[in-house]
Amino acid sequence: VQNILMKNLTDVCVGTISWWAFGWMFAYGPIEGLTKFAGNTEYFGHGFMTETSVGVIVPTDKPRDWFFQWAFCSAAATIVSGGIAERVNFPGYFFYTLWMTCIIYPVVVAWTWSGNGWLQGGTEQNINDVGYVDFAGSGIVHMCGGVGALVGAAVVGARTGRWDPEREGEFDPHSLPLIVLGTFILWFGWDG
């Protein structure tokens, strides 16, 4: 349990800094130049404030959007922690989180959600046009996290010393009250 909790905390802490520094830029920054690979401006929060004609600096809506999208980014990174639980050391997981929240997830978002990406062509109204349609992150968030967990589990292999081939059975949960509390928190978060 401590291993997974520490990895989830790492996802949030490292993910916040890397999403702020470069992730947002790759995902939602304006794409300048000939490529539609990923955004290449607005790193380190540039573009979150703007100057008016009278020289007053005022906030834009981007910090709100940044926070909302950061939550999706952290969720995608956290999905992997269950797939490689108790098998990856902390420095290895730290660099995975940095890579996922700074490069992998933002580039996938740039291709699909940003409005500038090469997969952004189809909409629900125009289904014959080739493009990507996603509902609430089902493809982007969960696919990035799921593929990351699959690759991670394949690379690190099975847990040693945890499985007994002679005795098959289910593991008892660590704390049933915490499982129920977590379920209620998820329900509350989903319902608003």
Show which residues each predicted segment covers.
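Hydrophobic alpha-helical transmembrane bundles of multi-pass membrane proteins
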Residues: V1-G192
